[in-house]
Swiss-Prot record:
Residues 57-91 are annotated as: Coil 1A. This is Keratin, type I cuticular Ha3-II. Residues 220-363 are annotated as: Coil 2. It comes from the Eukaryota. The gene is KRT33B. GO terms for biological process: epithelial cell differentiation; hair cycle; intermediate filament organization. Residues 56-367 form the IF rod domain. Residues 92-102 are annotated as: Linker 1. The keyword Transmembrane helix does not apply. The record marks 305 as: Stutter. Pfam families: Filament. Residues 364-404 are annotated as: Tail. Keywords: Coiled coil, Intermediate filament, Keratin. Signal peptide: none annotated.
Amino acid sequence: MPYNFCLPSLSCRTSCSSRPCVPPSCHGYTLPGACNIPANVSNCNWFCEGSFNGSEKETMQFLNDRLASYLEKVRQLERDNAELENLIRERSQQQEPLLCPSYQSYFKTIEELQQKILCSKSENARLVVQIDNAKLAADDFRTKYQTEQSLRQLVESDINSLRRILDELTLCRSDLEAQMESLKEELLSLKQNHEQEVNTLRCQLGDRLNVEVDAAPAVDLNQVLNETRNQYEALVETNRREVEQWFATQTEELNKQVVSSSEQLQSYQAEIIELRRTVNALEIELQAQHNLRYSLENTLTESEARYSSQLSQVQSLITNVESQLAEIRSDLERQNQEYQVLLDVRARLECEINTYRSLLESEDCKLPSNPCATTNACEKPIGSCVTNPCGPRSRCGPCNTFGY
């Protein structure tokens, strides 16, 4: 910042009312904060005209030159500082739309991916539970299928045994029919033989004479034969009826058993077909679930790989941004150090200005209001007026100021 100041006049038009102004010490000293500027003050002799000697004028000229150079350096440093601040502001404005939205979008993408991963995990767990349930159902159906298969084998064995019994009954029936045919043939042969014998006897008796003899009544052979024949026929008919009735009952029972067995066999076959269809459908569904699980696992692996690569890219971007921020911080620290240096320079410059002002004030105090009293004032040995060169000084009286 520019420093505006005014220098006190080289001549004092008013006199000190309370006490006489004394000059500084006649010994040489160095101004603090003035980088070892020679500020030797000459002897205590004063001109009556109130002007400075040659050494004091050179010191004031040197201080003015140093002050001008310091002010120019301060202005240059302020311009450099403003340029650096503008450059930092431009870089921050250029990088701001790249940092904040990109981080927010990456965070949103990461949250969405985490939600998708959680949904995939829950879906995988649900599929695993469904697969376990399907496995349990398949095991139940397998046990039922094995039970029904054993029942089917038992029914088939019963059917085979019944078929053997049916074959045996068929053989018995054929045997009985053969026996009945043989009995019929035997009956016919007996009838033929009986008729032949009757005819033969009739022929023999027809040629003989009829002799009436008182004897027991003759036996009617035809009647006996008819009775015998009737008895045999009744017996044969009874046996035939019994055999037919037994055969009918056995056949009916076998037919009922065969019908019931065939119905059970058909029901078992239909149930077996249905169970096979169910098992095939469950196997197809299980294979589809396995394929879905494999595809989901592959998709999850690909998603994890892709998102890990994206995360590594984001981490690298974050690392680059952090390095840029570290550079900016280092630049800011360097600028702060430069600013501290400028503040130190300013403090030293203000100290020099205060020293310069105190020197001018002390020189103003040296100028006497009465030129004739100069010798008396200078003859008194008084110590130095400058006790603290860097502090403000009180003036002996009002003085005019001008720009040097």
